A protein has these predicted regions:
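Aromatic-patch recognition
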Residues: 41-193
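Conserved glycine-centered beta-strand/turn positions repeated across beta-sheet architectures
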Residues: 28, 38-42
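C-terminal partner/receptor-binding element of secreted or periplasmic proteins
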Residues: 188-221
Length: 221
């Protein structure tokens, strides 16, 4: 449960970096692809929406960094960066610049779109990285035709990858065939896929700790 709270807290904190004119800019350090670092204040940003099934993953894809709060910032694209680290005063929050696995494609191929986004690092162990993002669950109904409910998505990547594989959204706990879908998400790791298929694994295990499956990846990979 503590891990679930830490995921949500990290996402909310980055979501709170939506810098309106009456809010304080946040300190950050951006690392570009060539290794150069840009330090300053993020004074604005833009977001990008990616599909995850019928749901939508929301990531920051453009940041504006200035030397001082209140100044106009220089624009930087996530496509040109490795990561950005936000300094909140009490802790640093690392966000990697990642492509997201193309909707309805297989993790074995790591196919992706053309635009990266920054994703919160919430797990890092033995070359396996867990990432969290804001999202909206999409529900089709008669009134209104579509409802979009704020939520979060957890993804993973192998260290050195540029593509994040989404594997968990809270509504998955109630989805028919959720174990099959999760097994595909981890098909790069045959032993993990077999573990998910087996009787010892329950989807509800991820409800309170979506990162617990990554410990199993580290153990079995």
């Amino acid at each position: 449960m503590k891990r679930l709270f830490s995921i949500i807290a990290a996402i909310i904190m980055v979501a709170g970096f939506a810098v309106a004119k009456d809010k304080e800019a946040v300190k950050c350090t951006l690392t570009l692809l060539d290794g150069k670092t840009i330090s300053g204040y993020m004074v604005d940003y833009k977001t990008k929406t990616n599909s995850y099934g019928a749901d939508k993953i929301i990531t920051i894809n453009t940041v504006y960094i200035a030397n001082n709060p209140g100044e106009a910032g220089t624009e930087y694209s996530a496509n040109d960066a490795k990561k950005i680290v936000f300094n909140t005063g009490s802790e640093d929050i690392e966000c990697l610049s990642m492509y997201i696995l193309r909707n309805n494609s297989r993790p074995l191929n790591l196919k992706h779109g053309n635009e990266k986004g920054f994703m919160n690092v919430v797990y890092k162990k033995d070359g396996i990285i867990g990432l969290a993002s804001n999202a909206k669950e999409v529900f089709f109904s008669t009134t209104p035709p579509v409802m979009k409910i704020p939520t979060y998505v957890v993804s993973y990547c192998v260290e050195g990858d540029e593509v994040a594989v989404p594997y968990w959204i809270p509504s998955d706990a109630n989805s028919i065939g959720a174990k099959t879908g999760l097994r595909y998400c981890f098909e790069r790791f045959p032993k993990v896929a077999e573990y998910i298929k087996g009787k010892d694994f329950k989807i509800k295990d991820l409800k309170d700790d979506p990162l617990s499956i990554l410990n199993k990846v580290v153990e079995l990979k």
